[in-house]
């Protein structure tokens, strides 16, 4: 899976889980501040990323994933 494919899939998951429009999502978007996620939304997003990409994201790493770019970079580096 290429980085571009990972980005597209992450965007799809964000749209599905957070109920935002795709055009609202930017690479620098913060899940809480820009996309309106609360802590439960963020946990559900991390769980969906783990499931979709077959990666384990430990809690200490999940706490550092606050933007779309950070989520994509994390997955790219784990693949």
Swiss-Prot record:
One GO term of the biological process aspect:
lipid A biosynthetic process
Question: Could you tell me which Pfam families the record lists for this protein?
Answer: PP-binding (PF00550)
Query: What is the designated name of this protein?
Result: Acyl carrier protein
* Cytoplasm in keyword set: yes
Keywords of this entry = Cytoplasm, Fatty acid biosynthesis, Fatty acid metabolism, Lipid biosynthesis, Lipid metabolism, Phosphopantetheine, Phosphoprotein
Q: Identify the InterPro entries for this entry.
A: ACP (IPR003231), ACP-like_sf (IPR036736), PP-bd_ACP (IPR009081), Ppantetheine_attach_site (IPR006162)
| Cross-referenced NCBIfam families | acyl_carrier, PRK00982.1-2, PRK00982.1-3, PRK00982.1-4, PRK00982.1-5
Compartments reported by the entry: Cytoplasm
Q: How is it modified after translation?
A: 4'-phosphopantetheine is transferred from CoA to a specific serine of apo-ACP by AcpS. This modification is essential for activity because fatty acids are bound in thioester linkage to the sulfhydryl of the prosthetic group.
| Residues modified as O-(pantetheine 4'-phosphoryl)serine | 39
Q: Read off the PANTHER family from this record.
A: ACYL CARRIER PROTEIN, CARRIER DOMAIN-CONTAINING PROTEIN
**UniProt main location, coarse:** cytoplasm
What protein family is recorded? Belongs to the acyl carrier protein (ACP) family.
- Domain (Carrier) ranges: 4-79
SUPFAM superfamilies per UniProt: ACP-like
Q: Give the source lineage, highest ranks first.
A: Bacteria, Pseudomonadati, Chlorobiota, Chlorobiia, Chlorobiales
Q: Which GO terms describe its cellular component?
A: cytosol; membrane
Q: Which organism is it from?
A: Pelodictyon phaeoclathratiforme (strain DSM 5477 / BU-1)
UniProt GO MF annotations = acyl binding; acyl carrier activity
